[in-house]
């Protein structure tokens, strides 16, 4: 099956971008989602020096990894954070990305503002000229209690009314935050899904436990079949966030990335 399959550098939360690049390359991947999430994983970030950003770009080129997407999470309900997100859009363009990922609220910071769907759709609609200028697509991630299902995110994307704003379907977040079955929820929004965070879920629904893909309870064969049947060729970006304790060392992260690669190859995918 021909589909972009990447690894989110957030799998290497707590480790350097250099370590992430090395591990992702070693597992056989050709695509990477860079992480620029404030207060969490800042592998690349707008306040880094131009010299440092060029250094990262050169390392990606040397490794043969294509930075096709960037996680640039900001609270899109907070007008004070929109300027920060525009900087993230420009950073994504600098790296030549096609996609920028954001949750509606903050991913790992406290939300300083909330808004109803109509209001946040208006804020996002105002970003469309910036997305057009830099030829990017914004994919809204299923994340947080209020925005934890694809159904809700699809409603917001439709309110925005632009082909440049779609849904990033996180297969584990919809369980952890939304308390829904991903295969059931997907059918509520599949026409609006343009990107997938391929993340597995283990343990109880409300427990932070996101192992290597294929090691948890998500029914990926069914999920893949639904996408194929709908002709939805959205890119996959693997995200592994382990337990609340985190991975014990870099070797554990590298092994989880490799295990995920082997699982997808066994499912018929080409990296």
Regions found by a protein language model. Give the residues of each.
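A short beta-strand-loop structural module common to alpha/beta enzyme folds
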Residues: 30-41
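Alpha-helix N-cap and loop-to-helix initiation/capping positions
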Residues: 44-52, 80-87, 112-122, 144, ...
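Histidine-acidic metal/acid-base catalytic patches
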Residues: 1-9, 13-31, 61-64, 96, ...
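Active-site anion-binding loops
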Residues: 39-57, 61-67, 122
